[in-house]
From Swiss-Prot:
It comes from Hydra vulgaris (Hydra). GO terms for cellular component: cytoplasm. Pfam families: TCTP. This is Translationally-controlled tumor protein homolog. Belongs to the TCTP family.
Amino acid sequence: MYIYNCIFTGKEVFSDAYPHKLEDEGFVWVVDGKYEELADQKFDDSLFGGNKSAEGEDDEGEASTEYKPVVNTLLRAFRLEEPVTITSLNDFKKALKKYTVNLMAKLNESNQSRVAVLKSKLPKYAKQWAEDFDKIRVYVTEGDGFEVEGTLVVITQDVPFGEEKPNDKCKMTVLADSLIKEKF
């Protein structure tokens, strides 16, 4: 099994346990995920101060009002966080610029030939993400939600965000040069 870690934070971004492919001549990883219902989590009135015995209610014959959350398998498995500092398109552009500058500096140290690839291919993705900003979500690795010092992870899906149901599909896109492949 291989784990793909952020080159900056060292934290997990994804693993080969999920369907994935290297696209655009090795520029981006696209990872397939889905939404699933958390069967082990139960939410009922007791979480919010409800006490059926004190209220004089009888459990018999009452319909269950349990809530089972639907979660993104990629976000859950790798503990990706939505950065609190990216709330608008302008915030996203600033974060992407900072990320790009940091990635180019890292590539200048380790693999200078990839800087030209980054400069030539990234504008296409940046333009698409900016145009579709209301249809994407940006995530970072665990613990990077405030500083946003590491890899930016873009999630897209076929259904509007907030309307997910079990088995709805999603895709993660991440720049290949911002990851380190590690055998686990």
